[in-house]
Amino acid sequence: MSKGKFYMTTAIAYASGKPHIGNTYEAVLADSIARFKRKDGYDVFFQTGTDEHGQKIELKAAEAGVTPQEYVDKASAEIKRIWDLMGTSYDKFIRTTEPDHEKQVQKIFKRLYDQGDISKGSYDGMYCTPCESFWTQSQLKDGKCPDCGREVKPAKEEAYFFRMSKYAQRLIDHINSHPEFIQPVSRKNEMMNNFLLPGLQDLCVSRTSFKWGIPVDFDEKHVVYVWLDALTNYITGIGYDAEGNSSEQYKKLWPADLHLIGKDIIRFHTIYWPIFLMALNEPLPKQVFGHPWLLQGDGKMSKSKGNVLYADDLVDFFGVDAVRYFVLHEMPFENDGVISWELMVERLNSDLANTLGNLVNRTISMSNKYFGGVVADKGAAEAVDEDLKAVVTGTYDKVAAKMEGWRVADAITDIFTLFKRCNKYIDETEPWVLAKDPAKADRLATVLYNLTESIVIGASLLEPYMPGTAEKIAAQLNTSLRSFEECTTFGGYISGSKVTEKPEILFARLDVKEVLEKAAAMFEARKALAEEAEEEKEEDVMELTKKPEITFEDFEKMQFAVGEIIKCEPVPKSKKLLCSQVKIGKEVKQIVSGIRAHYTAEEMVGKKVMVLVNLKPAKLAGVLSEGMLLCAEDAEGNLALVTPEKNMPAGAEIC
């Protein structure tokens, strides 16, 4: 019987590139919680996905020479591939470019505007593009973004703003009456003291300085800013409708039981998000947990250095479950954790190869050696058995208690305490000594049965954290993994079962020097590729010949517009010139251009081009020219007409 629903989410990953191991940690942590809850009897719905709008993506797409949609399609697929590689058992992978999400975001924005929570104004301050955050001068830290430490730039634009102060006291009251809402407690104190109690400013919720976003449908020069786009995925992904027609799934699952996010975005999820929900008259999530960061031990990860750690690289070296074990077990509850090649090798060798792998291998090998692989409980119990059984059957309660507070690392420690107790039991009972005395055959059989049963229970408890390893252990012992309830009683392993004849080595020991050498070679190769790509990129960039500066008043004197070439013919007695009739609004201008080596007259007809309209007329090769077509020229002298990205009408002014 189900213990009830459990709806949990991760923050959706920003689709600006391949996620490194620090980004991947959150997905693995969330997966371990989702798997634990499912196994513990809850009806779990686990949602993750990708955040796919914003200026940063627009810029990266332009840099890559693709459309923003093409860019995020590729980036989202790569993120999903990594999540799948790591065994992430999500129920929904949402993308914020999905039509259903975009439609609901527009509805939500309109509803909040209609009820007076959103109004139009203008923004004048500093902006951090990577964080997509606005800041006042007083909020900057040493003149830089207080969140990421990067450079900021001035920003001034028309925008819509959400009146945060309207709901601030209500949120303060909710936090005070629901101490579990923000966890760990240190994150709660930070939000209260640094943001809520000093007072909230209005929040910018639209942008006009870039186009890659969800349009505000009643004012389409604006796009919805990240907060109302990305955060609302938690409700749009399960069928929320702003007009009151939400799905049965939404009614069943909302409010979320857990938002699992990085500590760097705790403010957005514990202040902005609950206030949006209050404005929509929807219940607040039961808990927001801000996990710490996973940092690289030998310094900050940098793509330019070629030393970024990616999950698939680590999997190639260590295997999926070894990477899962490390990121889950080595992360403290509140403080940042560290990952390095040396630490990975150390943990694999000591915990996985020795404590766990060697235990399973020894137990199976002894069963094969002494009893032909048959494991039977002969009832020859001794006092030492009771302590083993107490540790084994008591482990689930300890693990469950740790998981109540999402102390995953501590839960795994409890499970490995079980395995360590099994290893101690081998030392205490000395099966190799018992095997020398035929009179003690029943005692030997009982010892091996107790070990096998203990390992099965341990593997069953380990399943949420290392699912592949747990299944391998069960298969080698010729049994199935247990429910958590079955892990609290001893003796479930069917007496007389036969284990595998050739046990598989779960984790092979690694040589740290060899691993470091291979990793260094990998990073060098990656760095070389990055440098080569940068050189190719630089080859596409020309040094601009600088001319004297002009004033804005000088610039205003020039008039540029879109023109459509309706007729074109070569200029007689010239090998370089073409004479074009260019429609600009209701007027047709004759323009002579030196582009005959690059375009035929036939190719020119029908093109939309950029025109300097008010250039003083002059004669070229005896033919009157009343303007100038704008072209770009590369280092080899190749010309290309400058054309509008979208189909614009002839006469549209260029501003």
Predicted regions and their residues:
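Helix-rich, typically C-terminal accessory recognition domains appended to large enzymatic cores
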Residues: 120, 343-381, 391-499, 612
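Phosphate-backbone binding interfaces of nucleic-acid-interacting proteins
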Residues: 535-655
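A glycine-rich helix N-cap at a beta->alpha junction
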Residues: 76-91
